[in-house]
Amino acid sequence: MTEQGTEAAKLQVESWYQKDKVLGVFLPECHESLAGIIAGRLREYYQKPAIVLTRGEEAVKGSGRSIDEYHMFKKLTEVSDLLLKFGGHPLAAGLSLEEKNIDEFRRRLNENAGLTEEDFKAKVWIDVPMPVGYVTEHLVRELSCLEPFGQGNEKPPVSYTHLRAH
């Protein structure tokens, strides 16, 4: 179900919202418990803030995941007149709104996004490049002790120099 929802969301983005700075997709048939996972996948894939909206019993519910350059909670406060409820922090949020307000919600978030194309470029922070000879099975086992990886505990990026691909 998550894969189907992710593919449906990507199809919407590719068809209608590719130029948007904040992705807002409405998946009425998707279960609300999957919205955050799908929003996270959209954020990773497009390197843009993403909000996935689903049809709830009483209102449309949404879950958002953001990038460092976009404070999602603050931006939701700017459109709070359209929302029934919302909460969150800089990188994630939950919300509810009436279905009739979806287009205006999406339009205003994009109009006031304050993001540039530079903000959508993935950033990788490398503390120290590592000689390839340091990568051993033992190191891989040691790194696995740091799991699970995710927000706030990212997979350690590794950088090598002087390598050639043939």
Q: Residue locations for each model-derived region?
A:
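Internal, active-site/partner-interface "lid" segment
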Residues: L91-R107, T116-V135
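Conserved small/polar residues in nucleotide/adenosyl-binding loops
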Residues: T161-H166
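Hydrophobic helix-and-loop "lid/oligomerization" segment in the mid-to-C-terminal part
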Residues: M1-N101
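Non-catalytic interaction/regulatory segments
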Residues: P131, V140-K155
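Conserved strand-to-helix beginnings and helix N-cap segments that scaffold or border functional pockets
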Residues: A35-I37, R106, E137-V140
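Extended amphipathic alpha-helical scaffolds
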Residues: P156-Y160
